[in-house]
Amino acid sequence: MRDELLDETKIAFITCVNSDDWYSECRLYLESLLIPEGMTAEFIPIKDAPSMCAGYNEGQEKSNARYKVYLHQDTLVVNKNLVQDLRNIFAEDTIGAVGVIGCRSLPRSGVWWDGLRTYGRVLHACEPESVVDSHCREPEGAYQEVEAVDGLFIATQHDIRWREDIFTGWHLYDTSMCKEMQRAGYKVVVPNQEQDFWCIHCPKEKPLAYEYKGYQKAFIREYGRELNPEV
């Protein structure tokens, strides 16, 4: 949706859902967030999506909210002041997207966690008895510009289509969106979380799916010439 049609008083939380139990937990945390006076929040679960990009595009089309948060069903947002924190960062119109963890410069592989300088913080709760504070570098100021962020949480203030024409599954959609933001002239940033983290992520421990490599090759074909890795 064009910027002039977006409603600055609304924030939408968009999630692809295949587990009602997980989404109920995710939604519980979202409904506990502090919503600034004059703003409203809407929650858009997308079920039976053929891919993450297709689901997120469907959610994007359903909302005219200026601020949209695309998050996994197993992401729990614990920062009560999230909405105001996002508004503060998005006061700079050139910022297109905010993630909670990512890398300053993508390596040739296109895999963000292989980058030399990773920024941000996420609490990973993969098992009931195992909680890991994944704490990378912290921005020196309120945020750090990065090239890519992880898809567990991506907030936007400009509507850019997710590349469902290329990423027809569940991998590399997030890094692709970051590159699409940059192609449109917008920055992608990670906030300072030194005092406290924004999200808990509860993924199941599992190896990378076999189709990951195929999407990695597709990513490199589309964006490889735009990568300038740090050495």
Model-assigned labels for residue ranges:
Residues 2-5, 19-35:
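Short, well-formed alpha-helical segments that are part of the catalytic scaffolds
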Residues 10-22:
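A conserved hydrophobic helix/loop-capping motif in glycosyltransferases and polysaccharide synthases
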Residues 49-63:
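Glycine-rich, basic loop-to-helix element that forms the pyrophosphate-binding segment
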Residues 68:
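Short aromatic/hydrophobic "clamp" motif used to bind/position activated sugar donors
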Residues 72-76:
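The conserved acidic donor/metal-binding loop of glycosyltransferases
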Residues 80-119:
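Conserved donor NDP-sugar-binding/catalytic core segment of glycosyltransferases
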Residues 130-156:
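A recurrent flexible, glycine/aromatic-enriched loop bordering the glycosyltransferase active site
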Residues 165-231:
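C-terminal catalytic/acceptor-binding lobe
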